[in-house]
């Protein structure tokens, strides 16, 4: 029985990983096709170049990238998709901004609203959560010990607002008006980033110190992550390592 149980757990984890990968690939393909509608020359279409870079980093096969670009020429593909932003508040002043790409705004709004409601939060009007964030460019490079300090110096010199260095990614934050120029200049020195987009950064963060609340928040963000229409979400929360680990048990 123990072996059977372990096998079932492995199957469950693999199934969850496969589902997450499928959603990621679908999201990458959708972004490539939408970006390519503005032109397929990546020299002039920086959103498309960013989408392709993200796709390559996440191992989306080359033929699927090419097919996604070709789909942009079909007027029936993604013609009725809308980019929608939702703002939500949970407990303790925690705010989350959700960015979605959808062909059915009623469905997506209902799904996102239901997720917040289930875990003790609610959607709020435009500006009621986003005032806690700054809107800026976000550029992610793979973290490499040999280039991190050089990246930091170069980014600050050409106008970046801030840069965060960690074991997985080096994240450069830029004013929106300098976003494209900074990508191009850094790319000449360090190669193209693994991901780049206009996003949200919290001005201050709320430290979650209660295990029960942490569990509820983790379930909420996992539910958002599982929703096919949700592209990205940004929150003003952080966990201590102990609380986060306790919340997973």
Swiss-Prot record:
- What Gene Ontology terms for biological process does this UniProt record contain? regulation of DNA-templated transcription
- SUPFAM superfamilies reported for this sequence: YebC-like
Cellular component GO terms held in the UniProt record: cytoplasm
Q: What is its main location?
A: cytoplasm
Q: Which GO terms describe its molecular function?
A: DNA binding
* Protein name per the record: Probable transcriptional regulatory protein OTBS_0251
Does the keyword ATP-binding belong to this entry? no
Q: Which organism is it from?
A: Orientia tsutsugamushi (strain Boryong) (Rickettsia tsutsugamushi)
Location relative to the cell: Cytoplasm
Transmembrane stretches, start-end = none
The record ties this protein, via InterPro entries, to: Integrase-like_N, TACO1_YebC-like_2nd/3rd_dom, TACO1_YebC_N, Transcrip_reg_TACO1-like, Transcrip_reg_TACO1-like_dom3, YebC-like
- Name the family: Belongs to the TACO1 family.
